[in-house]
Structure formats: structure tokens, C-alpha cells
Amino acid sequence: MRLFIELLFTALIAPTSFAQPQNILFNHAISFGSLEPRGSTSIGLTRVLAVMVEFQPDTDRRTTGTGIFGGLDYLASRGDTILDPYPHDFGYFTRKLQFLKHYFETTSNGRKQIAFTLLPTVYRLSKPMAQYAPPRASQDFTRLAQMVQETWRLVDSTTAVDFSQYDCFIIFHAGVGRDIDLVALTGTDPAPSDLPSLTFKLDGFQRIFGANFQGFPVNNGTTRITNTLVIPSTEAREIDGIGGKVLLELSTNGLLCASFGSYLGLPDLFNTETGRSGIGRFGLMDGEGFFNYNGALPPEPSAWERLALGWARPIELQGIDTFFKLPAHSLHQNPDSALIKIPITSREYLLLENRQRNPRGTGVTLTIH
């Protein structure tokens, strides 16, 4: 079979990173729960409710920081010239949600819309962070689920919120995520009681609270919360380097997008036991993707991810001697003409797309506030 394809832009270039840290491995699955039918959530409007929580202040050396927002001295001392600088406040998390909204509305070509509400109150939980942390190298997320339960009970009992107006729920918590394989990176894990970032689904909660669990009751039991994304305020931490401490700069932008991708039904596309890359930097649901550019600029979802979410209708190759123009996907000109499906067997196929970082050749100007 001969296939003639005119590539309007010939280079196929993976996203690269400035000063990309080496051997960054995400050390656990993103999702706790089965994948939901993608069509039910991946198209149309998702209404997001997000809250900010901190913990009882502590001096526990097994966690990073003091358990409260503003408790990471190494960030406070570096000013605003780093990724995800202080203050981590209402404005900071609003910008995170704006990034999430823009990312999905752009990469879906408008098929996915997000409307969000961030409550302005910082809610303080009843225990120090370490008491909500799962045991190290364990899949027992009971303590973390209890933190989620306490959070929504606290919000429901102290704030007038109509929870029925929302579909997806996010908890932004103080501190650093327990998401990097620090043993592989540095040879030791200095903060084993930090909290892992996780997307809880209903059946994940049911594994913990029982098969009859139908969500956390709120609004006098008239509404139930059946999902929650647990996201840290930052992934940046100090590690020991030659000559002293070194700041490992990692933003949560990519992690937030990947966690929302998990909510939409996308599977993890990396080895969740070892953290090793699966699809690399050409997609969202791989650590090399959502930690691309130090986590600040995740790549667009891969061709398969867009197809799985119902965002793409590829042109399927049916005959021989076929001539196609394949525009760069990132131009977002005609998304349904930017993906070709080539059947191999009844169950296997190739997806062909043209990926370009700078298809117009004009470069990008970034203004960082």
C-alpha cells in the first residue's frame, strides 16, 4: 500500500524543556477508581468547585513545610522569580483554575468547557498533615479519603454553597505533593508523610467506605459529592545538592490538567508501579508530559487521548494511492482534518498527526506576572 501525504509542516518535534530535571518519575497512579464513560463528561460544560485547605501547624520533619499556606520558607526567601511563587492565596489558585480552563477549552477546540468557582475561605482541618498521609508505598488511601470527607463536611457546615450546581470538586491543600520518586532522584525520601495527589472516583471511595457508599452528603443530604481531585499548592521542594540545598522547581499546572483528564476518564499512560514513561512528552497522561517544562506547560493531549475523549474524528484511510494534506494540529484550523487513522487489523490501528511547537514560525512571547 502506498500512502502519499503532504505535510504542510514536516518536522515532528517533541516538546522540550528548559532546564528540565532529569529522572523525574511520578510515583503512583493519578486515579483511584475505575474509568468513567468518557462521553458523559468529556464533552460540554463541567462546573468545578474548588476549596483551599490547610492543616494544624506542625514541626514534623516527615512533611514539607508547617502544614499551613505560607509555611514553605524556601519559597518565601526566593521571591517571585521562580515557578509558582508565593503567595499561595485566592489569586494564585484562581490562576491555576484559569490555566485549567484555557488548556481544555483550547485543546478540545471548544468541545470541553469549564466554569469554576473557588471559595475565598481557607479551611483549617482538625489534624496535622501527617495524620492524613497514606503509609509509604501503600495503596491504602483511607486517611486521605477521610481528609476529603472532613473537608466537605467542614465546607458544608460553615459556608452557604449549593453543591448541586457543580460536577467536579477540587481540594487545593497546603504543602508539597508526595508525587515524585525522591529515592530515585536523590537516594532518600525526606518527606514520607506528604500527601499524594489523587483523583478519587465514586468506586474508589466505595473501596474505603463500603459498597453502599454513594458520596458525601451535603446540603442536608440533598446532594452527594462523588469525586474529588486532591492537589498540592506546589510540587517545588528543596533537595540536597553538591554544596548545599537546591530548589527543584516543578509547577502544578500539568498535574492539575492530568488530574482533570483522569476525572474525564483518561487512563494513566505511564507505568504506575515504576513511574517509567509510556507515551513520553507527546501526551498529557504521562509524567514526562504533565511535568514538561518543569510542570508549567503540559503538551496538548495526544491523538489517541483526543480520540478517546471524543474530541477528534479522524480521516480513515480506505484505499491506496491516497493523497492527504495534514496540517499541524496546533494550528487548530480544522481539527477533524488533522488526524489520520490507518487500520492494521480489526483491533489495531495507527494514528498519524503533525505535531508542531511553533507552526506559524512566529515564536511565543511569555509574560509572567
Could you describe each region identified by the protein language model?
Residues 168-170, 174-368:
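Extracellular hydrolytic enzyme modules, especially secreted metalloproteases
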